[in-house]
Amino acid sequence: MKVILLKDVKGTGKKGEMKEVSDGYARNFLFPKKMAVQADSVAIKELNEKNKSKEIKAQKEYEEAVLLGKQMEEINIEIYSKAGEGGRLFGSITSKEIAEQLKKQKDIDVDKRKILLDEPIRSLGSTFVEIKIHQKVTTKIRVDVKEKQ
């Protein structure tokens, strides 16, 4: 019997997949627990429409991310911090501080986990920081660390 899974079922498949399962398994386990529906023409049509709308939504999100990435490449933020001899900072600039300054200076809200910083910035000067906007889109912004007077 062909069924469309409504939830992830261990050993059978993931949500939204159409699978061939035994009649007993479908009637006695999947249907009573509302884990699947029988794959008739109406259900198949509904599944195809959902998949199309998901693809359209994903494409739109990707295009918006590419546009935002191009805008963010031109961004330059300044962070002021106390520094000692040789331009070494007292403390360091973390992804959290960069996210806060992006929000404060440019009104762009970025999750600190999306800022890809190998290690915190510990010296004065310019650094290019990579930001992951979308799973397929990353961009770089310039962070200028200046000495606080």
Swiss-Prot record:
Claim: Cell wall biogenesis/degradation is one of the keywords in the record: no
Matching Gene3D superfamilies: Ribosomal protein L9, C-terminal domain (3.10.430.100), Ribosomal protein L9, N-terminal domain (3.40.5.10)
One MF term in the entry's GO annotations: rRNA binding
Q: What are the protein's UniProt keywords?
A: Ribonucleoprotein, Ribosomal protein, RNA-binding, rRNA-binding
A cellular component term from Gene Ontology for this protein is: ribosome
Give me any GO biological process, just one.
Answer: translation
* A Pfam family hit: Ribosomal_L9_N
Query: Which family is this protein grouped under?
Result: Belongs to the bacterial ribosomal protein bL9 family.
Name it. Answer: Large ribosomal subunit protein bL9
The organism named in the record is Clostridioides difficile (strain 630)
